[in-house]
Amino acid sequence: MNALQTLQQRYDLGEARAIYELVLKQRFGLSRTDILLGKDTTLSAKDKEELQIIIDRVAKGEPVQYVLGCEEFCGRTFLVNPNVLIPRPETQLMVELVKQNVAPGNSVLDVGTGSGCIAITLALAGYNVTAIDVSDEALAIAKQNAERLDAEVEFVKADIIQCSIFNFQWSALVSNPPYICESEASTMEKNVLGYEPHLALFVPDDDPLLFYRVIADYGQDHLVDEGHIFFEVNSAYAKQVGELLKQKGYKDTKIVNDQYEKERFVWARKIQD
């Protein structure tokens, strides 16, 4: 059984091919053209053995990004491991929302930074970024990514729920917090549920807006006048998050769809009356 056939035990042909090409590109430096020219069939015996080990792990359900130890985000390669969420394509759109509405040079706080992909991308675009996370392991990965990509980000261990962090006025708050209700776990793909950190995924069923409420409250005290707040959200709660921001006194609240036409982002401004 070849690699594609092995992958097709779990994935359809299109997904299997995409994973196969990703592995060959990331681990062995082969382009799609190289594959079309058959260079994947001329790997050394050692490389073929490594390829088979990778394919077998992915076929059993382990996310290919964790197997390879990296994922692309906004054109850059970020280190990942099971202590951080795998950066999603849709999250790149939140970075673009920040860039479209907040000028470089302004201060940004990234709440729940994980791999650091949002914070680092914004820092490299010219923003002054501080990023927090409750997990030491996540912060270790984020710091490695910042060092590899030569990005200046201040990383701090902090829990937004338990403390009022930094007596500072920010131009923008950005967060992709846990937003999947615990009751939704049974509907999730096993390769997400079994490998990605539950701390970064789930929020209690009885308080799905927990993190949005806490961050919005923090923003009322620590955003500059006309400062922005940006959230990635569970599409089932986008309108509720928008209403929450309005209730907290934010203005110009907007809900933005992702590339899959799901309501994925909510942003607003703090405007003094």
Regions found by a protein language model. Give the residues of each.
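Conserved beta-strand segments of alpha/beta enzyme cores
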Residues: T77, N128, E152-E154, K251-K254
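Mobile active-site "lid"/loop adjacent to the S-adenosyl-L-methionine
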Residues: Y179-F211
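Conserved Class I SAM-dependent methyltransferase catalytic core
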Residues: D205-R269
